[in-house]
Design a protein with these regions (language model features):
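Conserved NAD+-utilizing ADP-ribose enzyme module
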Residues: 1-117, 125-135, 141-222
Length: 222
C-alpha cells in the first residue's frame, strides 16, 4: 500500500483547506493501517518501516489501539525485541505515555514465561512518590543502583532511590535480559499497575549537574 505524502506534493498547499484536511486524514489512516497490517501479518520488516513512518506524527495512540488483541508469531516478537534493545528509549520518548507503551509491548514483545521474580530499579524520588515507576527493571541490584546514582536520577527533584519489588508473573511483560543481554542490564519490562509492593532500599540526595560532575570526577581519581 502506497502512503500518500502530502508534504512532498507541492500543489498541496494551494488546495482548499477542506481538501488539505481530507488528504492529511487519508495519510494518517494509511500510516496506522500499514502498522496494523504489518503486526497482523507478523511481518517484521514492514513493521519496522511503519514504526519509522509513525515517528513525529502523533498517531501512536491510534496505532496501539489498532493492534489490541493481536497475537503475532514468536519469530516476529523476537525481531521486535532485537529492535527494542536498540531503539526502545527513543520509542518511549516518542509515545510519551508509559501505559500505552505497556499495551504496545504486550503485543509486540516475546511473552514472559517465568514466575514471580525479585527485581530492582533506580528511579527518581519524584516517581517513587507518585508510583509512576518506569517500565525497565533489572534482576541486578548493582545495575539498578548505578542508575539510581546516575546523573538523570540524582539531578531530578528530590534526588533518587533504589527500589525493590517482588514482581508477580502477570506484572512482567517481557524479559529482554533473558533473551538478549548484550548490554548487561538484565532487563525486565514491568507493568507497574500490577506490582503489589515496592520498597526503598536506598535514598540518594538531589544534586545539581555541577555537583554530580565534581563527585564523579573525584571518585574517578580514587
Amino acid at each position: 500500500m502506497r502512503i500518500p505524502d502530502v508534504e512532498a506534493d507541492e500543489a498541496f498547499f494551494s488546495l482548499p483547506r477542506r481538501e488539505q484536511a481530507r488528504r492529511i486524514r487519508q495519510r494518517e489512516n494509511a500510516l496506522v493501517a500499514a502498522f496494523r497490517d504489518a503486526v497482523q501479518g507478523s511481518d517484521a520488516e514492514r513493521c519496522w518501516r511503519a514504526v519509522q513512518a509513525l515517528q513525529f506524527q502523533g498517531l501512536w495512540r491510534r496505532a496501539v489501539r489498532s493492534i489490541m488483541g493481536m497475537n503475532p508469531s514468536d519469530v516476529f516478537r523476537r525481531h521486535c525485541l532485537e529492535s527494542w534493545v536498540i531503539w526502545g528509549d527513543s520509542l518511549r520518548n516518542e509515545i510519551g505515555e508509559d501505559l500505552f507503551l505497556i499495551e504496545l509491548l504486550g503485543v509486540l514483545m516475546p511473552k514472559y514465561e517465568g514466575g514471580a521474580i525479585l527485581l530492582y530499579r533506580g528511579d527518581s524520588f519524584f516517581n517513587r512518590c507518585r508510583r509512576t515507576y518506569g517500565l525497565s527493571w533489572t534482576s541486578s541490584r548493582k545495575v539498578a543502583r548505578s542508575f539510581a546514582d546516575g546523573i538523570f536520577c540524582r539531578t531530578s527533584k528530590g534526588g533518587s532511590c533504589l527500589l525493590e519489588t517482588y514482581a508477580p508473573h502477570d506484572a512482567v511483560i517481557c524479559a529482554p535480559g533473558l533473551l538478549n543481554n548484550n548490554y548487561g542490564k538484565d532487563e525486565f519490562i514491568v507493568d507497574r499497575r500490577r506490582l503489589k509492593r515496592v520498597d526503598i532500599l536506598e535514598r540518594f540526595p538531589e544534586e545539581t549537574f555541577e555537583e554530580h560532575r565534581r563527585r564523579v570526577e573525584a571518585v574517578a581519581k580514587l
